[in-house]
Every structure is written in C-alpha cells, then in structure tokens.
C-alpha cells in the first residue's frame, strides 16, 4: 500500500512508531490518501460491512473544522477513475451532530458503514480531504481495518 498518495495537496508525512506500532502522521493537511491499488491487488471486502480506524488530532483546531473520509472501490476494471468506481463518504467535525465529535488530543474511533458502496470487491483508496479552510493542521491515523 501507499500510505501517502499525494497529488494536488500540501499534506506532508512524518510517520512514526510507538512500541512497534506504525502510526500515519499527516501534517499541513488539506488532502491525502492511502492507496492500495498500485503494484498491489485491491482489497475484496465484499463480506465486510464497516471500515474502522482511530484518528488523533494533536494540535488545537478551529470550531467548524472537519475531516472528510472517503473509501473508493475501483469497480470491476480495478482502476481508480475507470468510470465504474463507487465511493462512500463520512465526515467527522466539531458539530454536535458528528459521531464521533472531533476533539483535540484524544484518540477517536471512527466506524464507517460501507454497505452503501455499489461494489466492495475492489477497494483501492481511502481519501482524507477537507475543502474547508477551518480544518486541523494535521492528524494521526492508526488501526485501520475492515470488519463485519
């Protein structure tokens, strides 16, 4: 996989390790993705119902901040952008209606229902994006997995 898929963005990567656990560390955040469809097979998650990950935001961020998370299935052609992709999106924010609500310096477990994806047998990307100028400057991601 490529944990730092990087076109059209300012985000930098400063990953680190804690007790043998690799933590993705995204800095100067606006857009970044994890890509697992180049030089490796896509993931068949047709039996899975949820994408789970932990997110930690170390620095203060303005009210109204958000992180949009998108899971992309490459479709039957196995190619992102091939015309038959499907995407499910999920947003965490400072809004009281967000679940979980973004907080500083605390690990947040994010559970994303993926049953709405038209296809789940060629997963190829996880995208973290925010067009909102009110966004965290960076965040950590750990424990990314699919489950039923």
Where does each model-flagged region fall?
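Beta-rich carbohydrate-recognition modules and glycan-binding surfaces
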Residues: 1-148
